[in-house]
Every structure is written in structure tokens, then in C-alpha cells.
């Protein structure tokens, strides 16, 4: 049931801003933020004292270390927002495979990205393509803005299926809803 979300895993949750929005929206939602230990400390300080902060939990994980475990709970939703574009295709497949291990039969993985091929306007696609060049040449040498077919292939190679694809969210995002 899409309307009965109680337990969310936010992978790469950063400052906890999205997690705070979730707990403010629904008093029955619990969110676990999976991120690096130092990032979780920043998140805890940022959300401290805010209404609903007691329903946000941290799970320390270095996503690139395959022996760093994901939570074993079965989550209703696993959320990755503009996260997978930070990794190579093989790393994306590995991350999605590990996320699938935290999914039950009714769980869904939501992947939100800006795919250059799904943009409404040609100029937006061009800007996203240039962002990819920046990541590759200047930033970390690994990140890039993906064509949606490449991301979908990584997700399906991880053993997941695309249940739904929603384009034109906000200023050009796409959400891929995946299941086991």
C-alpha cells in the first residue's frame, strides 16, 4: 500500500534536511539516515531539539566498503536523492544490490536523479551534461550525470525492477521507483 509508509531508510542523507521534512509531514514515520560517521554527527547537531528529531536515527556506513553493512531492517521505502550519480556504474550496481538486502517484498527503492536525457528543455540537458564534465575533470573524477538507460541498467543488474518512472519533478528531476 503506497499510503502506509512508516519506516524509511535515507541513504546519503547528509544533513538530515529531507528526513526532518518526512517526520514533520507524518507523526508516525521513522527515518534512518545512512551516511558516513562524521556526516551523521553533523546531522545530529542540525536536527537536535527539533520536533520529530527523536524519530530520526543514524546508521554509520562507508558506502564504498562492501563489508560496511546496511541496516538489516525491512524498510517501506529506501530513498536515494542525487546520490548515485556520485559513483561509477559498478559502484551503483553494488550499492543497489546492498540496498535490496534491506528490502522486504513490499519495500520500494526510490532513486531521484537529474538525467540529461529526461529534461524538458534542451538547455537544461546541456547544463546537466556540463555538470558531468565538471565532476569528471575537476571534482572527484568519478561522478557524472547519467543517461537514464545507464542508471536503469545498473539498477536491474542489481536484481531490482523498475516499477514506475516519474519525470519532470521540480526543475528536472526523475524518480525511479524500484522493487525486488
PLM regions and their residue ranges:
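Alpha-helical subdomain
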Residues: 2, 9-180
Amino acid at each position: 500500500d503506497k499510503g502506509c509508509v512508516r519506516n524509511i531508510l535515507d541513504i546519503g542523507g547528509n544533513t538530515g534536511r529531507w528526513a526532518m521534512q518526512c517526520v514533520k509531514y507524518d507523526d508516525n514515520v521513522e527515518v534512518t539516515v545512512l551516511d558516513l560517521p562524521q556526516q551523521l554527527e553533523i546531522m545530529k547537531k542540525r536536527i537536535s531539539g527539533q520536533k520529530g528529531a527523536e524519530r530520526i536515527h543514524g546508521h554509520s556506513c562507508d558506502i564504498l566498503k562492501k563489508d560496511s553493512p546496511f541496516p538489516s531492517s525491512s524498510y517501506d521505502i529506501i530513498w536515494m536523492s542525487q546520490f548515485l550519480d556520485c559513483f561509477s556504474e559498478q559502484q551503483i550496481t553494488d550499492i543497489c544490490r546492498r540496498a535490496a538486502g534491506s528490502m522486504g517484498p513490499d519495500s520500494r527503492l526510490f532513486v531521484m536523479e537529474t538525467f540529461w536525457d529526461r529534461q524538458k528543455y534542451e538547455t537544461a540537458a546541456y547544463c546537466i551534461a556540463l555538470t558531468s564534465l565538471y565532476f569528471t575533470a575537476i571534482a572527484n573524477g568519478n561522478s557524472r550525470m547519467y543517461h537514464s538507460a545507464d542508471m536503469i541498467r545498473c539498477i536491474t543488474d542489481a536484481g531490482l525492477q523498475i516499477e514506475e518512472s516519474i519525470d519532470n519533478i521540480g526543475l528536472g528531476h526523475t524518480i525511479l521507483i524500484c522493487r525486488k
